[in-house]
Amino acid sequence: MKGMSALCTHHDAELDADALELAIVVPTFNEIESIDVLVSAVQAALEGHNYEIIIVDDDSPDGTADRVREIARRDRRVHCIQRIGRRGLSGAFIEGALATAAPIVAVIDGDMQHDEMLLPAMLKILRTRDLEVVVGSRYLEKGGVGNWTGGRILVSQLATAVTRRVTGVTLSDPMSGFFMIRSEMLRRLAPQLSGIGFKILLDLFITAPSVIRFAELPYRFRARSLGTSKMDAKVALEFVELLLDKAVGHIVPAKFVIFSVVGTLGVVVHLFVLTLVFKEWGFDFESGQIAATLVAMTSNFALNNALTYYDRRLSGWRWINGWFSFALASSIGAIANVGIATYLFSVQETPWLLSAVAGVLVGVVWNYTVTAIFTWRRT
């Protein structure tokens, strides 16, 4: 995956009694309340094994990274990677996995909702069988989802069914964030992974050029007792963006597709408002066009802010400033649209439909590029 950094280490590959067996990667954000408990629980589960715990923190404002460093000063098996300006579980896991010399790497949440006691069984399977991945599944017999509400269970089951149908992945729990993988395979696939959102397991299975050999073990998803949940509508949007990225990301960015869909909806909004103001309310055409443009522009901005750039969402005064930035970029894009289309039709004698499409494409590309840089720039 582009732009990923890694703390590269070297380790004797000879499998002796002192060889590093396993790395546990723990992506965190605001998990200071649970991090001590998690480290102790993993250590108890892996007693007798040679392992390291790599905690990858997305610059948590609650001081999670500082707490991890305090733990690491007393225990050399614990390491901290603090990421600045980058967010997301998938990217954090990839960076952590690339930072270890262990032949096998696992990912586990920092909130104690995954069952760390399953780790030895997962490790044994990978060490004794010709498999590449072992997945902790909530949907096998003896597994479970804890105290989830009926609505959340329904959404999860629907997402699982859609994923299996669309991607062909046969996992019982493709949304699982608890699994173990051979490091060599992860390093081989890393440059092609999207690194979007939470669903790194699904990303791996879609990206792999051949069918992954895997096993699944049941576990019961625990109720969160420490910290606050990160699950919200963003997770669903990340899921959609991941599927789009895997489907068309080699041609155009997934965000460009969403941006274009929003723009198409904007055309519908524009025509609706124009019809309402001009035809129904009896205002002149120019007034109707101005009203329709302002409403459609605001609609596009709001939808892009909520959907396309859910990971950089603006609020408060930044929303207002963003609207002005978006409106300016869109106005210039509209001028470019009209100018290109008119030139092609009038000067180059290009058919009117092709001229119009070319103008629209120029406008959309301009709007997407400029607003991504200035309106929703990464901070």
Language-model features: where?
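N-proximal low-complexity "stem/linker" segments adjacent to membrane-targeting elements
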Residues: 1-44
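Conserved donor nucleotide-binding strand/loop of the catalytic core
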Residues: 51-54, 65-99
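Acceptor/aglycone-binding surface of glycosyltransferases and processive sugar-polymer synthases
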Residues: 81-99, 104, 116-198, 224-234, ...
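Donor nucleotide-sugar binding loop of glycosyltransferases
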Residues: 31-34, 60, 115
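Hydrophobic helical membrane-anchoring modules
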Residues: 1-19, 168, 192-275, 301-331, ...
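A conserved acidic beta->alpha catalytic loop
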Residues: 57-66, 112
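Cell-envelope/extracellular polymer assembly enzymes that use nucleotide-activated donors
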Residues: 21-23, 52, 203
